[in-house]
Amino acid sequence: MTTKMFYDKDIDTTPLENKKIAVIGYGAQGHAQANNLRDSGFDVIMGLRPGKSFDSAKKDGFEVYSAAEATAQADVVMMETPDELQAAVWEKEVEPNLKAGSYLGFSHGFNIVYGLIKPNADINVMIIAPKGPGNIERRQFVEGGGIPSLYGVHQDPTGDTAEVAKAYAKGIGSGRAGILETTFEEETTEDLFGEQAVLCGGLTQLIEAGFNTLVEAGYSPELAYFETSHEMKMIVDLIFEGGFEKMRHDCSNTCEYGEMLNGPRIITEESKQGMRDVLKDIQDGTYAKKWLAEYNSGLKDLEKMRTEYKSGLYEQTGKKVRAMMPWISDADKYSTAADTEQFSAAK
């Protein structure tokens, strides 16, 4: 089935004009969306708790309130707190102050799909999901571009939620790149699967396994890092620009033959079955239950895994290699202050 792509020229922003937008959260997506919307001429306020994000939003010139106060003023409320915090923020601050006929938005459908947030039937519920991290979203917008977004509708009592969602997506710059329709279930399932099986989980395991294979065979960790990790961006850029065809065209014949011959030895039927198992856990809610149980237990397993990865040879080698390339830090100029502080030591 062909999915229609919407661009700036296709979208009327009138449904969003004269509406006050409250963005709840000022992390990567909240920061990017709030700033992009304001630069597009929309009326944006922030709903935040006291802390670094509150101070950062104030410094950036926003009117900042508690989530409850911002919700009470707003026509559109965009939930941009982390997935694991949204249900509590919703229950304590947003739901009691949300007016009938308001528009409740999400950038990820986790809490709706798994039943953690259940808005009343008189609330319009929509999703606007940018397909990229917040700092890239902001950078592209400032430089005159945008990143694609998905939009969808879960509840539509006023009958115009899709138009409001598309106008919002245009406001954050996605109409410059393309806006596609989705559903909450589709976005949530595909997003979680992509992160876990390919983009983050699959890719990091592949990179580290390749790195360790070379090091265990006696090769230099620094050179192993270059071959299995540093060059990854260049290959992905080629795929991003023109698919596998461009990547293969720009690589040598030796590379192309070896890739086609030996790639299937790495991604085997067993690997594919693992992907199907991951997908099933996402679809039936198993992963969501595990993640919420982990969060509610204090993130003990996650913190343990974080510590193990940070102290590993791959990460330590990466720090040495990245120190040779100080220009990499230029990518951080559109990150939030909290992001920059958190990751500066990892350069």
UniProtKB/Swiss-Prot annotation:
Gene Ontology molecular function terms on file: ketol-acid reductoisomerase activity; magnesium ion binding; NADP binding
Catalytic activity: (2R)-2,3-dihydroxy-3-methylbutanoate + NADP(+) = (2S)-2-acetolactate + NADPH + H(+); (2R,3R)-2,3-dihydroxy-3-methylpentanoate + NADP(+) = (S)-2-ethyl-2-hydroxy-3-oxobutanoate + NADPH + H(+)
Binding site for substrate: S252
Coiled coil: none
Domain KARI N-terminal Rossmann, chain residue ranges per copy: 3-182
PROSITE patterns linked to this entry: KARI_C (PS51851), KARI_N (PS51850)
Record's keyword annotation contains NADP: yes
Positions with a binding annotation for Mg(2+) 1: D191, E195
The keyword NADP appears for this protein: yes
Catalytic machinery residues: H108
Residues that coordinate or bind Mg(2+) 2: D191, E227, E231
Cofactor note: Binds 2 magnesium ions per subunit.
GO biological process: isoleucine biosynthetic process; L-valine biosynthetic process
The protein's annotated pathway: Amino-acid biosynthesis; L-isoleucine biosynthesis; L-isoleucine from 2-oxobutanoate: step 2/4; Amino-acid biosynthesis; L-valine biosynthesis; L-valine from pyruvate: step 2/4
Cofactor(s) required, per the database record: Mg(2+)
Enzyme Commission designation: 1.1.1.86
Gene3D superfamilies (alphabetical): 6.10.240.10, NAD(P)-binding Rossmann-like Domain
Xref: SUPFAM superfamilies: 6-phosphogluconate dehydrogenase C-terminal domain-like (SSF48179), NAD(P)-binding Rossmann-fold domains (SSF51735)
NCBIfam families: ilvC (TIGR00465), PRK05479.1 (NF004017), PRK13403.1 (NF009940)
Record function comment: Involved in the biosynthesis of branched-chain amino acids (BCAA). Catalyzes an alkyl-migration followed by a ketol-acid reduction of (S)-2-acetolactate (S2AL) to yield (R)-2,3-dihydroxy-isovalerate. In the isomerase reaction, S2AL is rearranged via a Mg-dependent methyl migration to produce 3-hydroxy-3-methyl-2-ketobutyrate (HMKB). In the reductase reaction, this 2-ketoacid undergoes a metal-dependent reduction by NADPH to yield (R)-2,3-dihydroxy-isovalerate.
The protein, known as: Ketol-acid reductoisomerase (NADP(+))
Gene (UniProt): ilvC
